[in-house]
Amino acid sequence: MGNGTWEGCHVDSRVDHLFPPSLYIFVIGVGLPTNCLALWAAYRQVRQRNELGVYLMNLSIADLLYICTLPLWVDYFLHHDNWIHGPGSCKLFGFIFYTNIYISIAFLCCISVDRYLAVAHPLRFARLRRVKTAVAVSSVVWATELGANSVPLFHDELFRDRYNHTFCFEKFPMEGWVAWMNLYRVFVGFLFPWALMLLSYRGILRAVRGSVSTERQEKAKIKRLALSLIAIVLVCFAPYHVLLLSRSAVYLGHPWDCGFEERVFSAYHSSLAFTSLNCVADPILYCLVNEGARSDVAKALHNLLRFLTSDKPQEMASASLTLDTPLTSKRNSMARAVAAGWVASPPSQGDQVQLKMLPPPAP
């Protein structure tokens, strides 16, 4: 891979060496544990044959892969945009970093469309809301986004400027093929999914407004969920794509015009850093989108808190962090029956629990 010196634009990498790494450190600290928890909860939903869990699990996996690249980007910005880890790692981590943006947008779009079908056409498109269908759609998303964003892997992505800074996945001004690829990313990777999300939101609003059986509180929750999907994409990704489109359009109109690149350099880096907030917003979205997920997450957090605050950690570990089994479920059912005035005869293994009513107390 070549990394020769080129006479590019004069961009001052010192002006933004604090904000992006600070934001990335925050995302690592918050996004890593919350996405691990979301991944576990999504897996539980998939085991319950919930197709929504498939999309949420893939979203968590993409976020975790992205978070794993952030320590090297923190180091990159702290060294004033100077990549010191070699060309191979630049290609790999840059590829994961930028591809995650469009994988996340695609899965947010899948969630939005899935919710539209569930609310507006619960019976008509029931076959499209099966786990097998969600797995197939997720496979197509991964294959499409990985393939579409793999072009930089076949080009040089390390560039050394006149000040001996080695840029990774950045060149000012950009190259011609990069400008055209950016247009594809903006219109196909960002605007098209966002348009589908807007249409889904409109369809959800019409379906909810016309439903007489849905309670007002439930209608508000559905609207809030659909709007939160659109807001995540708009807040996290729109500023970056506005600047990406502007840089690409200016280059295609006036190649090697450094004035615009130098003016937007700091804003561009800040908008790129803002895309990482998606990894913090996604787990919050996960709790909003699924009632069972909220219950799973709340139960896990409660058990973890009890474990951390218990005087007997080993006892709490065995008592609080044990997953339900058929046997423990039976025991819990028996306990609830006794509390309600029922007595359960001790069941043998594989037998059903036999319940007998207590006789009324003697007068």
Curated annotation (Swiss-Prot):
Site (Required for activation): 145
Chain segments carrying region Disordered: 344-363
GO biological process: adenylate cyclase-activating G protein-coupled receptor signaling pathway; angiogenesis involved in wound healing; glomerular mesangial cell development; negative regulation of angiogenesis; phospholipase C-activating G protein-coupled receptor signaling pathway; positive regulation of inflammatory response; positive regulation of Rho protein signal transduction; regulation of cell adhesion
Single GO cellular component term: plasma membrane
Glycosylated residue positions: 3, 164
MF (Gene Ontology): G protein-coupled receptor activity
Domain notes: A multitude of proton-sensing residues, which include extracellular histidine residues (His-155, His-165 and His-269) or triad of buried acidic residues (Asp-63, Glu-145 and Asp-282), contribute to activation of the G-protein coupled receptor activity and pH sensitivity.
Protein name from the UniProt record: G-protein coupled receptor 4
